């Protein structure tokens, strides 16, 4: 329950402005949505201008690292080399790799190759070869602010099937971004992504989705890609979250690697993940 604030009191967002000149009308609008039965965000996941600026600075490091990998990833490279690049570049720019030691995760990045859905472990034994597709999932902490993004890369000449699913998955993300509008719903994003995937003969992983980002690595809300249009949480200015659907060639089912309890594989052949180049900012 939010504490009642006087109209002339400092706003809860930390802006220093009076509540009546800052978030009073905003809160009244959220209250109207809530009274109609909509799921509305709590204040702790709504970022102020200072926080958004800090998160964007973290994003700059994250994007720079992914840009460098994009220019230098190649056939014959092992994924442990990618992990070293991420650690060295991130720390040299004053950041911290967010995955490193997060809930016991032992690397600075996730490198998921071919049928790995996500959370692939970098390894000297995983050597990239022509025809591979790889997702590099990079996350950065800078001055306490978190960013999270990944990119898909194709190695050498890939099959038409691989090229097609990479293209369609990117289209899914772009459609999801277009659907993410203030005072819309998370379900609008899901509908845009799931519809396009299914129209092209693909499935969307249901149990794994996007998440809030910024002050912690994983925040509310959970961003599903299979819920109906107009459902789930209302999107309001100041929310920040990732849009990172996992699109499968076969069924949406997956299993977790029993050896490391992290890496997730598709139950049949072929799975890709693609995310936006930075968290979606609804400011």
Question: For the regions a protein language model found, what residue spans apply to each?
Answer:
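Acidic/negatively charged segments and metal-coordination signatures
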Residues: 1-45
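Active-site cores enriched in adjacent His and Asp/Glu residues with nearby glycine-rich loops
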Residues: 62-130, 179-218, 233-241, 249-257
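Acidic, low-complexity central loop/insert segments
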Residues: 129, 153-165
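Short, charged beta-turn/beta-strand-edge "cap" motif at the junction between a beta-strand
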Residues: 139-143, 246-250
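A conserved acidic, glycine/proline-rich C-terminal tail/linker
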Residues: 248-271
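Single conserved hydrophobic/aromatic residue that forms the stacking wall/gate
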Residues: 274, 278-283
């Amino acid at each position: 329950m939010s504490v009642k604030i006087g109209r002339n009191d400092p706003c809860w967002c930390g802006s220093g402005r009076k509540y009546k000149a800052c978030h009073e009308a905003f809160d009244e609008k959220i209250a109207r949505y809530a009274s109609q039965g909509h799921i509305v965000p709590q204040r702790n996941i709504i970022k102020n201008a200072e926080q958004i600026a800090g998160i964007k600075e973290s994003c700059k490091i994250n994007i720079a690292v992914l840009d460098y990998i994009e220019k230098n990833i190649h056939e014959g490279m092992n994924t442990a080399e990618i992990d070293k690049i991420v650690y060295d570049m991130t720390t040299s720019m004053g950041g911290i790799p967010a995955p490193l030691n997060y809930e016991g995760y032992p690397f600075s990045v996730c490198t998921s190759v071919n049928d790995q859905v996500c959370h692939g472990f970098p390894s000297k034994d995983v050597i990239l070869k022509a025809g591979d597709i790889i997702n590099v999932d990079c996350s950065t902490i800078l001055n306490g602010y978190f960013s999270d993004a990944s990119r898909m890369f194709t190695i050498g000449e890939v099959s038409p099937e691989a090229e097609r699913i990479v293209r369609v998955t990117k289209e899914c993300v772009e459609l999801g971004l277009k659907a993410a509008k203030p005072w819309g719903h998370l379900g609008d994003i899901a509908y845009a992504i799931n519809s396009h995937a299914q129209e092209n003969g693909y499935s969307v992983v249901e149990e794994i989705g996007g998440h809030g980002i910024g002050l912690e690595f994983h925040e509310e809300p959970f961003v599903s890609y299979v819920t109906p249009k107009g459902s789930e949480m209302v999107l309001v200015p100041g929310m920040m979250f990732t849009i990172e659907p996992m699109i499968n060639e076969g069924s949406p089912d997956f299993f977790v690697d029993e050896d490391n309890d992290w890496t997730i594989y598709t139950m049949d052949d072929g799975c890709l993940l693609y995310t936006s180049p930075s968290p979606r900012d609804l400011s």
